[in-house]
Amino acid sequence: MVPSTFSRLKAARCLPVVLAALIFAGCGTHTPDQSTAYMQGTAQADSAFYLQQMQQSSDDTRINWQLLAIRALVKEGKTGQAVELFNQLPQELNDAQRREKTLLAVEIKLAQKDFAGAQNLLAKITPADLEQNQQARYWQAKIDASQGRPSIDLLRALIAQEPLLGAKEKQQNIDATWQALSSMTQEQANTLVINADENILQGWLDLQRVWFDNRNDPDMMKAGIADWQKRYPNNPGAKMLPTQLVNVKAFKPASTNKIALLLPLNGQAAVFGRTIQQGFEAAKNIGTQPVAAQVAAAPAADVAEQPQPQTVDGVASPAQASVSDLTGEQPAAQPVPVSAPATSTAAVSAPANPSAELKIYDTSSQPLSQILSQVQQDGASIVVGPLLKNNVEELLKSNTPLNVLALNQPENIENRVNICYFALSPEDEARDAARHIRDQGKQAPLVLIPRSSLGDRVANAFAQEWQKLGGGTVLQQKFGSTSELRAGVNGGSGIALTGSPITLRATTDSGMTTNNPTLQTTPTDDQFTNNGGRVDAVYIVATPGEIAFIKPMIAMRNGSQSGATLYASSRSAQGTAGPDFRLEMEGLQYSEIPMLAGGNLPLMQQALSAVNNDYSLARMYAMGVDAWSLANHFSQMRQVQGFEINGNTGSLTANPDCVINRNLSWLQYQQGQVVPVS
């Protein structure tokens, strides 16, 4: 038998070994907290990974994974799931987790398009209390909450964010800073007040002034940018120029010595093609001059209404609109007398170039692919056209290397470095109307549209632009045929200022919104009004015959003191409106191309003479004239952000996809006269 003292000594010697084994065994099975690296932004994963880690963890580590999962879900567009998980967060959080939760609350509000809610939450956060990666997200949230509307606060947020970013993100930040600066009007820029120590912001504002002074002269702009870089060598924009200004420095004018004009010269669209050709050739041989932005129109002659011309689908509209959709249908027997221009004009013009070689190609006689091959063989330096939308879409599929000013635009715009899109469309007018109505301080618009695809497209375009400008819900109401309107007048029913909300479909991954809104049926009186408030603006898309019923029906139902201002597209404009019509339209504002609003009297008379006083065709003639100006400034429109031409169809600028936007003239019926809107 072994003595007990020996057993105790042996056990005592073995105990440290056993304890050590147990300790090391425990260390071997413990998983270190990996969430910290992800919380600090040094590692990233998707929501599925974070959710799996959350299920396998406990306590603070579990909360960290939960916060990371919420952030990933928001980034992946799974807002509903993110909100559900956010609401499951415990009340007890450490300081770091509490800061992350607050920032996530802001990002969820932004994902829900609750910009006011996001701004309220941002006001409660002190950026200095955040980690560096959180600060970058904080400033991005400030930027997103601004909805792209240029302001001094947006500029400060972009400037504060820039040092926190990597090289790729820095370029995006600098481009966004320049986008905010170049989106301002000169009047807005002049009202900005900054602090004495805001050196970076001062540098950006000086660059903005260089751009304002020289944007229509690429050579002067190049010199101005180079001088600015020397004066502000430490400005982030001097070290890494905005992409748009890099394009300016690389600017080379396009040649217009050999022009290919692609138009339909046979079939239903021939009248429009030949009219555009007339305007283009007149500008080529005579040149163009800047058009006055504001005019003062006198009353028109009292002439009977003329019959409407035949319409042709697919012409001069980005969304299968007929020419009648975008031009209005009332030919005039006599030009509308107007007074002299009231304001100064822009300096951009397109000189005549009779020696330029111009060749016309008939797109109605052979396939476009054959025409493009022939154009290339003929050595054309620029293509103007085609006019029909299906031809423009075929042009895109061809991947032509030629510079092209298309006279229409496809359903889905493609940004091509060699293509610009110029179209007269009701959608353009609707977007211009949204800007005009918003500028007049209106908050609750109703769009009154025909029951047709045209009406749907106009409603969608107006609502998109309205929300882009920071507006809320837009209402829409549809009307039927002229006979239905006449029956409404005879029945004394009138038109109530109520409508159904235009619900825009969700945006795609590329940020584009689908073309058609979700529309409801014609509303009754007890349906929605805008956010529970009274409609204060009505945008009407109607022919002269339709609006002659619509305006009295609005007054019949709502009285003259409804408080809503009425606006109309150029579709309602007729150059021969008699005194009774003008008095009936009292107070109505409507848009018109500057040429027909009196901004270019000589060309107006020339155009009306060429088209037998048909106002619809006169607009197409003006389009041909402006196409010459745009072709001569193709490189500027394509490369120089903010370049502007005071054209006959509108004040012409290009968006980043080189879609030519038109700002129209606005006129108003006042005591039997037609006057510019003040």
Curated annotation (Swiss-Prot):
Provide an example Pfam family for this protein.
LppC
Q: Region Disordered: which residues?
A: 302-339, 507-526
Signal peptide interval: 1-26
Query: Which keywords annotate this record?
Result: Cell outer membrane, Cell shape, Lipoprotein, Membrane, Palmitate, Peptidoglycan synthesis, Signal
Gene Ontology CC entries for this record: cell outer membrane; periplasmic side of cell outer membrane; periplasmic space
Q: Is Cytoplasm a UniProt keyword of this protein?
A: no
**Record GO biological process:** peptidoglycan biosynthetic process; regulation of cell shape
Membrane topology category: Lipid-anchor
Q: Which InterPro entries match?
A: LpoA, Lytic_TGlycosylase_superhlx_U, Peripla_BP_I, TPR-like_helical_dom_sf
Q: Where is the composition biased (Low complexity)?
A: 330-339, 513-526
Location(s) in or outside the cell: Cell outer membrane
Lipidated residue numbers (S-diacylglycerol cysteine): 27
Major place of residence:
membrane
In this UniProt entry, which residues carry a covalently attached lipid of the kind N-palmitoyl cysteine?
A: 27
Q: List, in alphabetical order, the Gene Ontology terms for molecular function in this entry.
A: enzyme binding; enzyme regulator activity; hydrolase activity, hydrolyzing O-glycosyl compounds
Q: What happens when the gene is disrupted?
A: Absence of both LpoA and LpoB leads to a decrease in peptide cross-linking and to cell lysis.
Under PANTHER family, the record lists: PENICILLIN-BINDING PROTEIN ACTIVATOR LPOA
Its quaternary organisation is: Interacts with PBP1a.
Q: Which HAMAP family match?
A: LpoA (MF_01890)
Can you tell me which family this protein belongs to?
Belongs to the LpoA family.
- Describe the task this protein carries out: Regulator of peptidoglycan synthesis that is essential for the function of penicillin-binding protein 1A (PBP1a). Stimulates transpeptidase activity of PBP1a in vitro.
Quote the protein name from its UniProt record: Penicillin-binding protein activator LpoA
**Source organism:** Escherichia coli (strain K12)
Q: Gene name, please? A: lpoA
